[in-house]
């Protein structure tokens, strides 16, 4: 091998080592960055030069010309990503449900320093006393007093529960807005990643980190599945319906009930509509709802995934009439 060839081999090793050190420095710099994925440098040998061929020999006489930086890849596990996002969605479902139950317990148990059960027990005691002596003006007056107390407390409980329903309705609107924002961001990142990686030379690791972080957050809000194609596009489905497909984004709309003002998430792409005189669209969301709330909540059926679905179930679709 010529002297310059030997020097080139050494230079390629130094250059590849420098690239590996740069990757290590990048990992250390971003160790506390949310969503960052550790990167790994892959090295491979450059092509070999054949000196001579001998059919009787085990192999040809060759020598290498150095080492090459093959790729800088992310160290991620697709199976673990899918499992984490699914289970984080299930965790958020039960966390949201627990928060709602806790709030209802507070309304029933911490009303003005005295729980609702006390007023109910006092009313029942007054009725029992009246049954012993119906002609007694004292027991009659006590029943009237206890009844008034019970009605006042019942009205207060009803108002608190109604206000909490409105609060849940507001949270539902905010979460749908957040989901749509995530969809637009994934669509934009798909476009950027595709442009960078189309030449087969560069790998958009930092953009992929951002997209993976968005998928992590999206998995907490709803039941979603995703897949990546050969171009680097990630397609996302929510509740078995397309949400992002390549460079396409399908928005989730909100239909407000005329009677209650409660929002129902629906797929705009699947809903029929009529154009009103003022130019606005009136949607018919039948069959276009994002969530089927009639399904039995079950881990075996995967119907207990996503904080948004938990809020919809907790809020209900009507106001109670007590």
Segments (PLM) and residue ranges:
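Structural signature of extracellular appendage/secretion-system components
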Residues: 1-322
């Amino acid at each position: 091998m010529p002297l310059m060839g030997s020097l080139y081999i050494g230079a390629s090793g130094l250059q590849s080592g420098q690239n590996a050190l740069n990757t290590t420095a990048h990992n250390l710099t971003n160790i506390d960055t949310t969503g960052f994925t550790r990167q790994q440098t892959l090295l491979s040998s450059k092509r070999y030069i054949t000196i001579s061929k001998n059919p009787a020999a085990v192999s040809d006489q060759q020598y290498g010309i150095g080492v090459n930086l093959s790729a800088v890849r992310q160290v991620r596990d697709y199976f673990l990503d899918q499992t984490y996002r699914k289970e984080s969605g299930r965790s958020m479902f039960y966390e949201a449900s627990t928060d709602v139950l806790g709030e209802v317990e507070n309304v029933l148990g911490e009303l003005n320093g005295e729980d609702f059960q006390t007023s109910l027990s006092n009313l029942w005691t007054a009725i029992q006393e009246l049954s012993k002596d119906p002609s007694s003006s004292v027991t009659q007056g006590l029943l009237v007093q206890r009844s008034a107390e019970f009605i006042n407390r019942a009205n207060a409980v009803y108002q608190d529960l109604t206000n909490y329903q409105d609060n849940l309705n507001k949270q539902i609107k905010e979460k749908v807005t957040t989901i749509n924002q995530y969809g637009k961001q994934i669509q934009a990142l798909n476009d950027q990643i595709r442009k960078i990686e189309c030449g087969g030379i560069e790998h958009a690791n930092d953009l992929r980190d951002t997209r993976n972080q968005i998928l992590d957050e999206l998995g907490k809000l709803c039941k979603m599945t995703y897949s990546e194609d050969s171009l680097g596009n990630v397609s996302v489905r929510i509740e078995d319906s397309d949400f992002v497909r390549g460079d396409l984004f399908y928005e989730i709309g909100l239909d407000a009930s005329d009677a209650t003002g409660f929002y129902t998430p629906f797929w705009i792409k699947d809903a029929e509509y009529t154009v009103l005189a003022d130019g606005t669209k009136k949607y018919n969301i039948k069959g276009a709802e994002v969530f089927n709330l009639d399904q039995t909540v079950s881990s075996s059926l995967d119907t207990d995934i996503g904080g948004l679905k938990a809020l919809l179930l907790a809020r209900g679709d009507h106001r109670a009439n007590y």
